[in-house]
């Protein structure tokens, strides 16, 4: 019997979320790394609409190894809902929770820095 491949997720930071060839497009080891790159792009290339994207590696899915934007806000969640496979996938939902934590930590840090 063939061993079933583990389903995994990979993250990317895109300097230009719409046209990846217009800027840097970096494969990241973790969501935290992708978020740091995304923040850098927001400071240096905000007009290029930076994004964080993900790819699910699942040999049993037609969506395997396709990149898709990770929602950066609740209004972006609508795009994810267009693809039920992604919207309901536990790895994607965990990534969204992690991203929300990272964003909250960044906001707290920003408020602390302003208060100084």
Protein language model regions, located:
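Surface-exposed loop/edge segments in extracytoplasmic proteins
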Residues: 20-24, 63-65
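Function-determining sites in protein domains
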Residues: 24, 28, 58-60
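Short, intrinsically disordered, low-complexity terminal segments
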Residues: 10-11, 31, 43, 92, ...
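Short aromatic-glycine-(Arg/Gly/Cys) micro-motifs in beta-strand/loop hairpins
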Residues: 2-22
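A short, charged, amphipathic alpha-helix used as a generic interaction element across diverse proteins
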Residues: 28-49
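Short, mixed-charge low-complexity intrinsically disordered segments
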Residues: 43-109
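Non-Sec secretion/translocation targeting segments of pathogen effectors
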Residues: 108-116
